[in-house]
């Protein structure tokens, strides 16, 4: 009697490269996305018109730019039908909601540095946080960190500069 069992090969057992955790929504968030989709699926066909994508996203609190909309439509409407299914809409919104969460997390971290609420991270703020975290960094190293993130040359790091450097380092 021949067995259908095959011994695993090196190729079949090798680790796939991790791309990072796939963003997921809570059931409540999925329900919100479904309700926004259904608002624009008036005929109950299970699809919405690509022209309605922006309005549906606005209903969920997002303000996508024109270039971003073109890119999203190209990603989800590959056949050029002008229609988007709920699953495609859910995929787009899952990504957008994950990005929003990431931005909020980064801004929370920014506020921990900005304890004097100036809207900027100064050398003094950075030095305090480094000390609190037990990081043994020289003043020169701390200044280099400020200089690396400071795009407008004012010697401090504002929210936009902080967001940019955190995304660039892939820490978020």
Curated annotation (Swiss-Prot):
Family designation: Belongs to the centrin family.
Binding-site positions, Ca(2+) 2: 150, 152, 154, 156, 161
Gene that specifies this protein: CETN1
Region ranges (Disordered): 1-30
Physiological role: Plays a fundamental role in microtubule-organizing center structure and function. Plays a role in sperm cilia formation.
Gene Ontology CC: centriole; centrosome; cytoplasm; nucleus; spindle pole
UniProt-recorded name of the protein: Centrin-1
Cell cycle among keywords: yes
Organism encoding this protein: Bos taurus (Bovine)
